[in-house]
UniProtKB/Swiss-Prot annotation:
Pfam families: UBA_8. PANTHER family: UBA-LIKE DOMAIN-CONTAINING PROTEIN 2 (PTHR31993:SF6). The lineage of its organism: Eukaryota, Metazoa, Chordata, Craniata, Vertebrata. The modification N-acetylserine is found at residue 2. The keyword Acetylation applies. This is UBA-like domain-containing protein 2. Residues 144-164 are annotated as: Disordered.
């Protein structure tokens, strides 16, 4: 690579490091140079040093990272958070509150249409009105029961089929 290309690549790596680590550009450059411009190595070094309060006094001491997505929460803290959660039993026991009634009841304009069909009657599927021949293989809906279809809709369907 030419000198300009290397400088450009290094500048881009420094900028990416600053964005990823949230440190100053000069610190990013020092870490990247120390890691021979290996981005992951420099990033690991940065986060290991930032988690060790006195890294130059005790270089052999390693601390567990505490603020990373892969680190589980502190176990006692997690237990305390779970103990604050409530179950739905608390909602049922306090059903006199208006919020509990709203949460457990259907809305006032709720229409249970699915419960209106007769027990042995299955509502047929109505095919889409797109230009295909699928509707020729399906029976036409017969809801409500006992209602007969007039000749006009069948003539319209025949006319539509003739145009295809």
């Amino acid at each position: 690579m030419s000198v300009n290309t290397d400088e450009l690549r290094h500048q881009v790596m420094i900028n990416q490091f600053v964005l990823a680590a949230g440190c100053a550009a000069d610190q990013a450059q020092q870490l990247l140079q120390a890691a021979h411009w290996q981005f992951e190595t420099a990033l690991s070094t940065f986060f290991q040093e930032s988690n060790i309060p006195n890294s130059h006094h005790h270089p052999q001491m390693m601390c567990t990272p505490s603020n990373t997505p892969a680190t589980p929460p502190n176990f006692p803290d997690a237990l305390a958070m779970f103990s604050k959660l409530r179950t739905s039993e608390g909602l049922q026991s306090s059903s006199s509150s208006p919020m509990a009634a709203v949460a457990c009841s259907p809305p006032a304009n709720f229409s249970p249409f699915w419960a209106a069909s007769p027990p042995n009657h299955q509502v047929p599927w109505i095919p889409p009105s797109s230009p295909n021949t699928f509707h020729l293989h399906c029976p036409q809906p017969t809801w409500p029961p006992g209602a007969s279809q007039g000749g006009a809709p069948q003539k319209a369907m025949a006319a539509m089929d003739g145009q295809r």
